[in-house]
C-alpha cells in the first residue's frame, strides 16, 4: 500500500511536469536579434561618458558587429574573407612612401599604455602598449603572450620592401590580415599618428633595432 502511494505521487508529479513542459513549448521564445538588442541596451546603460571616453565608443562598425556575432562560434571562411577584404581596403600608406621611422621612438611607443582613457590628457600622444601582448626587444623581460612573439621580426622575414609594407599594414589594420584579431587597428582607428606608425614599423624592421639582434 505504501509503495502504491509513492508511485501515485510520482506519477502525478510527472504528469504535472509534462503539462508545464507543454505550456512552455507553446510560449514564444525571444529571437536572437531581440536578445542581442536587449543585451546591447543593458550594456550601454551601464556606461557613463567621462572625459574623452564617450559613449560613442560603444558603437560598432560592420567588422566589429560581425566579430561580435561570431564571438562564441567558429568564424566561417567566407565571413573571414569578407572582413579581411573590407579592412584591407582601409589601409592608407604615407603619401611620401616613407614607411620606416625611428626605432628608438618605436620602443617608447611599444612600452607606453597611455592614451584614450578618461584619466589621460588627450593632448598627449597615445602609446601602443605592444608589450602587453608580444615579445619584442629581448631586454624587456615582462611581456604578454596573447599575440605571437615579434622578436627578430625583420631578421626572420628579410629586410625587404615587402616586409616593411606588410608591417605597416598589420599595424595599421590587423583585421586586414587576420579577421577578428585581438590587435587594435592602430591606424584605422586613429590611435597612432602616421609618424608613430612609422616608428613602430622601424622597431620591427630596422636592422639596428634590438628586436632584430
Placement of each model-derived feature along the sequence:
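Generic anion/oxyanion-binding catalytic loop in active/binding sites
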Residues: 94-95, 119, 186-189
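Local sequence-structure signature of Cys/Sec-based thiol-disulfide redox active-site neighborhoods
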Residues: 118-129
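Secretory-pathway/luminal and periplasmic proteins that interact with or process carbohydrate-rich
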Residues: 116-119, 139-143, 210
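Extracytoplasmic electron-transfer domains, predominantly the class I c-type cytochrome c fold
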Residues: 34-48, 101-105, 131-205
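Post-cleavage N-terminal segment of exported redox proteins
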Residues: 15, 20-116, 170, 203-213
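Bacterial N-terminal signal peptides that target proteins for export
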Residues: 1-13
